[in-house]
Amino acid sequence: MEKPWKNTITELLGCDYPVISGPMRLITLGRMAAIVSNAGGFGVIAASGLSREDLVRELRIARSLTARPFGVNIPVYRPNAAEALEVCIDMGVRVVYTSAGSPAKFMDAIKRAGLRVIHKVSSMDMARKAQSAGVDAVVAMGFEAGGHIGREGVTTFCLIPALVRALRIPVIASGGIGDGGGLLAALALGARGVEIGTALVVTAECPVPEFFKEAIVQSASNATVVLGREAMPIRVLRNIVTSRVAGMDDAAADRAIAAQGDARYVADGGTRDTAVMPCGQVAGLLAGVVPVDELLSGMITGARSVLESLGSIVCGGRP
């Protein structure tokens, strides 16, 4: 394992590297969270779609596999969000990752319990509101990210420096990041850490069908399409199903996406041509399926290598 880094995010989350796993419904559960944390990153259990009993089970699984810190993502708009938070508090989770709504209504309970909280945003307005609510950091998601994204259309390269200049709290970059160069670029823009999602899907341990992983690594950066921009935009790989939905108006596309249900279950029962496969534009940079620890160590090693190369250029050397 690479030598641990130390900055505001690693200290806040208690991890070795400032790399957190993007929460993915029914995919990043207890086992995946533990694997990421054991590899030096910060694993996150996605509570979306889990009952109280399910979440308790996944927390126990994670704790049986790692002694390292991990967090739980709670989409605020979900009807059982308060219940999920209650489980996290009762079971001693130290970091809650809120998204899809304002965290303000939960902040009193979170702070009383002594939890740390990070919140996902995709715009300046959302970030300022999250900071005012009292979150400890924000995950800023650029438009090139996979899965459900913001409607603002602002890319990571533009969103991150704008938020860094405007906020007092740390910013974690999300969207278009999957290697050491992306990690270093995010840090150069002022982020204190990164979130990875699509790159995590393309790991040996990720519990999605192999055709999903193969489709990602065989794709170019322009192989994705954004569906349902009105209410719940989602970036996915192009195939027969997405081509049909892309021809609908936004409202109809939103209904069609909702009717598909969870992406993992669709993939389990479908094929590369018929499954809805959330995927970011970073797919064009992912060369193959690797273990999680190799992905993370490669990002850290790669970032250091790029930094050394840039150092020689800045100091007057040749690239």
Each language-model region and where it sits:
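Conserved active-site-proximal phosphate/metal-binding subdomains
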Residues: 150-172, 178-319
